[in-house]
């Protein structure tokens, strides 16, 4: 294991390979665990509106810890922070396996994920620089989405076989991620910062203000937040849409449909890495608008094959849209507030959007609005929101 403090800027350095492997296993566990736990809720006869609540407690951990996790990522070697965070995920998954309340166990996984995210993205700026940063983001997103593809399917398929087996597979994936983290080089950190919680909160709010007052980073924050809020809501919408629109009631089919989105995002992320630079980020905006349009069209489908094709298209558009926004925020944020703090602020925005959208979706399901009209309204509103963001960006 290398302990070098020097950065090897090669896109395929030993450290970068370890980051990608750890990211894949951790994201695999996250996505398999979601569908395995949803199957557990279904088996234990929880109400349908409680399904998005599961994700809400997960993202709630992100929001509550947002003022602190960025400084943690910047104050310690990011590879070690990632290892600790994956250990928390392992503990959360294991607790669900052993019969602890699934909402409590999933909250613990959320705490681990909150600590993990600033470190996993912040380390990219330490392992590579300049023009390779967008490509590194493309690799990171491709790894994550490949994990979403395989993890989602594995979670659903294994849960149809036996829920406990699915949960155990998630714990095993997190354990593998912990091992992979050991091989990430121990790069220089920024120790010596205050650990007073009030001061940390104030510092985080200052970072929020700094990024929000910069037009480029504000644009990136809003765009990425809208995308990920919509993405997680679509995932839960599919769980209810499949039996209504397609008449299929198993756990696996929604995961197959989610996998189509994942495949598309891998393609879109690769295209963005080749076609978009930090100077041409606005090229991604038409793709964002089209996401909403295609979601609207998708909601009206009643056949499986068109549903697969449209969801893959949504993924392609999504990958092309979000990868340049992530790279822009990391590059500008690293120079102003530190990479870890920049990603922590991004997480706050994204997870606040998720919490809001999931809350609205859960409320809509609770009051009895049919899932197809929910999907139509969701797609239309997303397209309008991205259009408004693009108009604002061009004017400023």
Curated annotation (Swiss-Prot):
Organism name: Shigella flexneri serotype 5b (strain 8401)
UniProt entry tagged with the keyword Thylakoid: no
Gene Ontology cellular-component terms listed: plasma membrane
Keywords (A to Z) from UniProt: Cell inner membrane, Cell membrane, Lipid transport, Membrane, Transmembrane, Transmembrane helix, Transport
Source species, domain of life: Bacteria
GO molecular function, one term: lysophospholipid:sodium symporter activity
Side of membrane Periplasmic, spans: 1-17, 74-90, 166, 247-255, 301-303, 364-365
Role noted for this protein: Catalyzes the facilitated diffusion of 2-acyl-glycero-3-phosphoethanolamine (2-acyl-GPE) into the cell.
Coiled coil residues, start to end: none
Full protein name: Lysophospholipid transporter LplT
UniProt lineage: Bacteria, Pseudomonadati, Pseudomonadota, Gammaproteobacteria, Enterobacterales
Membrane topology label: Multi-pass membrane protein
Stretches that traverse the bilayer: 18-38, 53-73, 91-111, 145-165, 167-187, 226-246, 256-276, 280-300, 304-324, 343-363, 366-386
Cytoplasmic face residues: 39-52, 112-144, 188-225, 277-279, 325-342, 387-396
Compartment annotation: Cell inner membrane
SUPFAM superfamilies per UniProt: MFS general substrate transporter
Keyword Transmembrane helix: yes
Pfam families attached to this UniProt entry: MFS_1 (PF07690)
InterPro entries: LysoPLipid__transptr_LplT, MFS, MFS_trans_sf
The family this protein is said to belong to: Belongs to the major facilitator superfamily. LplT (TC 2.A.1.42) family.
